[in-house]
Amino acid sequence: MNKFYYFNLALFISISFLLIFTLLSALNLIQSNEAAYLIGEASRWCERVSGGLFREPINTLSNLGFMLVGLYMFWVLSNDENNSSNPFIGVNKISILYASVVIYLGPGSMLMHGTNTEWGAWADNLSMIMYIILPWLFNIYSMSKWTISQFLYTYISIVVIYSIWRWFTDFELGINFNLFGVSIGLWVISEALYRYWSPVFRFIAGFAGFLVLMLFGTMPNEVIENFNEFWWVILFWLPGILSNQQPKYSRTYKWFFLGMISYLSAFAIWLTGVPDHASCSPDSIIQAHGIWHLLTAISTYFFFIHFRSIKTI
């Protein structure tokens, strides 16, 4: 098989999506007619809603960043030797999954910003979930007796169940459960476990989730006082329960922190990309939400390098 087979396949699928998406948009077959009255108004993410090709042109096209970064990952993987024990070096099921999910972050978000439809919002949210659950599941896989098949089955099961549940409810699944937000905590917890694994730390690591909550503005006393809303904090101990083996490798954490800095910077900018913020300029070609897309795309690459950086302990 040509070593660039998967890169070429990903490139073909990406270009095909862009062509079909643009054609359907040009024919006005996928935009929301119910929300047509919003044309000319500032969208939820500040940019003025357009009656043209895409409802939010800048917020739509900025998602090309995800597709380009994901394609570059495929290029890097295609040039690797395939004899590495690291699943993020060379072409294999896990590396293909990661790069593919990064690419899909682009189309998922395009479908929302380009159409302003409920199903587009569902596709966008699903793409985010498909990405964010992957790192912490991979970390658990790396600290357990899971086989690759078990890892993939678990990942696919979560995605399928979530996609159906989310379709019929909302982004909190009707039970005050934001899987995307919780997964950020689970990722940080699993990274702490990977770095400092010990039998005792397996049960301490869950508290790191509260540091993540504090970083995003939720204090521990709020969790205690409103436990019916924050019941999901019990999941912070899931990585420790499942990670029953010390990892065989170490990682270079500078790439993880660069990824986090990029993501948190993007999040800070994301907060300004709303109509009632003083910096909102609906007609500007520089949109805060577009910058959010580009910076988070960069963060996925930093995390990619992070997972590629393992060394034998």
Placement of each model-derived feature along the sequence:
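Early transmembrane hairpin module of multi-pass membrane proteins
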Residues: N2-V233, Q245-F257, I261-T312
